[in-house]
Curated annotation (Swiss-Prot):
<dbReference type="InterPro" id="IPR002639">
    <property type="entry name" value="UreF"/>
</dbReference>
<keyword id="KW-0996">Nickel insertion</keyword>
<dbReference type="InterPro" id="IPR038277">
    <property type="entry name" value="UreF_sf"/>
</dbReference>
<dbReference type="GO" id="GO:0016151">
    <property type="term" value="F:nickel cation binding"/>
</dbReference>
<comment type="similarity">
    <text>Belongs to the UreF family.</text>
</comment>
<dbReference type="Pfam" id="PF01730">
    <property type="entry name" value="UreF"/>
</dbReference>
<keyword id="KW-0143">Chaperone</keyword>
<comment type="subunit">
    <text>UreD, UreF and UreG form a complex that acts as a GTP-hydrolysis-dependent molecular chaperone, activating the urease apoprotein by helping to assemble the nickel containing metallocenter of UreC. The UreE protein probably delivers the nickel.</text>
</comment>
<dbReference type="GO" id="GO:0005737">
    <property type="term" value="C:cytoplasm"/>
</dbReference>
<keyword id="KW-0963">Cytoplasm</keyword>
<comment type="function">
    <text>Required for maturation of urease via the functional incorporation of the urease nickel metallocenter.</text>
</comment>
<protein>
    <recommendedName>
        <fullName>Urease accessory protein UreF</fullName>
    </recommendedName>
</protein>
């Protein structure tokens, strides 16, 4: 293994990376509002469902297709179309925009600059999983490691946000993360088996909850 890309991957997935992930629940705040997520157990259940649904069939599959050579502009357009909840779509673009900006300064490459150029020209929007994937691929990170890092970084940021919002204790958050290991490993296996027709096949219940968040009266998060 290359220590160079390993260190770069750790930097890219560190919770201190200023992408704004702390401001997004990606739907779980709606479940808190409805009393469905209220403690360690119920959040862990929601999180594992989120990993097996949206993270696998949307973000994870986008990453795999990118590594397999599918045009980044095509994938960008499909992601914009399939992320039905406005706040979640905007979250992907805001965090993706920050990743593109940070990557351009810290991990510059011709591939990354080409994607940034598409975004500047208005030909692409700049989604988070694609920004991450372009940077990771240009660094020589293998697909499975990139998937594992991206999925677990998302799980970590959501858990940190749940610790504040529910609230949970710090140790409870760590137990949730440990319980998510198998879900992330299973998601990597599932993503490898999916086909193009599966791209964006997310649970309607999750999408509806994400849409409800827009009109929620009291909110801690932007999504």
């Amino acid at each position: 293994m290359s220590a160079t890309y390993q260190l770069a991957l750790q930097q890219l997935t560190d919770s201190a990376l200023p992408t704004g992930a702390f401001a997004h629940s990606l739907g779980f705040e709606s479940y808190i509002h409805r009393g469905l997520v209220r403690d360690e157990s119920t959040f862990s259940t929601w999180l594992q469902a989120f990993v097996s649904q949206q993270l696998s069939y949307s973000d994870g599959l986008a990453l795999r297709f990118l590594f397999e050579g599918v045009d980044v502009g095509l994938l960008d357009g499909v992601l914009s179309a399939q992320l039905l909840a406005r706040e979640v779509r905007e979250a992907s673009l805001k965090m993706g925009g920050r990743l593109l900006e940070i990557g351009g300064e810290v991990f510059p490459s011709a591939e990354l600059e080409a994607y940034r150029g598409l975004v500047r020209a208005g030909s692409a929007s700049g989604h988070q999983p694609l920004a991450f994937g372009v940077i990771a691929r240009s660094l020589g990170v293998p697909l499975e490691e990139a998937l594992s890092a991206y999925l677990f970084a998302t799980v970590t940021s959501l858990t940190q946000n749940a610790v504040r919002a529910i609230p949970l204790g710090q140790n409870a958050g760590q137990r949730v993360l440990r319980q998510a290991h198998d879900a992330v490993a299973a998601a990597i296996h599932v993503v490898a088996q999916l086909c193009w027709d599966d791209f964006g096949a997310v649970s309607p219940g999750l999408e509806i909850s994400q849409m409800r968040h827009e009109r929620q009266r009291a909110r801690m998060f932007m999504s």
